[in-house]
Every structure is written in structure tokens, then in C-alpha cells.
């Protein structure tokens, strides 16, 4: 069985940048350990915005410029990037919370073989839950897991709410 790890938005702006949190900083070690020990394919997502961010729907609701492509904040956290240095992985630049391309990329990797998917990263309550639900909707019979020790939300409360939502949608939360 193929195993796929989706590392969601472990970018500087979400870890210790303009939208960073203490909880996000605290999970970096767990994320690095997960990447280092994972035996399977890895997909890394990048929240990707441009100079017009504040004029977008998201920018109007969250008027904090972040993950602008080409800026330091768009780059992966340096420890996460180091963990990926010797690994083969695919990247997905997503323009919104969830990637509608992600299921097709998983399909290319698995080519009809049995597989499982594990998601880790930031933010539990926005991009992790969005991508987990997109994958579960696309592959309802596949084991989709979220490792809560490798995730952090905007707040601890919304992190826990997202974990509950995913459990209710038959996503395994460990």
C-alpha cells in the first residue's frame, strides 16, 4: 500500500511570521520528525498569494498580507525545508484554503494502487481541514488521517473544533 504525507502550509508566515503562533512554533519539531521518519511519498502545499492579496475576497476578510510569492514569509520554515532537503517531494501552490488539484496529484502518485493519506501542518482550522475534507470527498473509501501533534490552529480552541469536525467526517485523528 502506498503512503502519502501531505505537509500543509508549513511556511514562515504561519509559523513565526505575520500570522504565526506559539502553537505553530511548538509543532515544528514534530513535523520535522514526521518528515524524517515517513516512508512514502510527500506532497508539500504552499499558501500562495500575490501583490493584489488585499483586493481578493480572502484579503477583504483577513486583511493581513501573508505568503506573498517571492517573499521570505512564503518560504517554508527553515527546519521543515532542511528536513525535506534529501527527500523527493511534490509541491502544490494553492491560491485558497483547499487545493482542488490535490486529489488529482494523489491519483497520479497512486496510479490505482491502494493508498492512505496523512496530513500535517497549518492551520488545522483552515487549510488542514479544507484539504482533508477535499481528499475524503474525493476518496471516501481511503484512510485519511490527521496527526494532531503535527498541527496547530489559529487558536487552541479552533484547532480542537477542527479536529472534532474532521472526526465527524470520518477522518482519523491521532
Regions from the PLM with identified roles:
Residues 1-91, 112, 160, 164-167:
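Active-site acidic carboxylates
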Residues 20, 65, 120-121, 150-151:
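A generic structural signal for short
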Residues 30-35, 129-139:
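Histidine-anchored nucleotide/phosphate-binding helix
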Residues 41-46, 143-150:
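Short internal beta-strands
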Residues 84, 106, 110, 138-139:
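Active-site catalytic pocket residues across diverse enzymes, especially alpha/beta-hydrolases
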Residues 91-130, 152-174:
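Conserved N-terminal glycine/acidic-rich loop preference
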Residues 119, 139-141:
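Glycine-enriched alpha-helix->loop->beta-strand junction motifs that scaffold or abut catalytic
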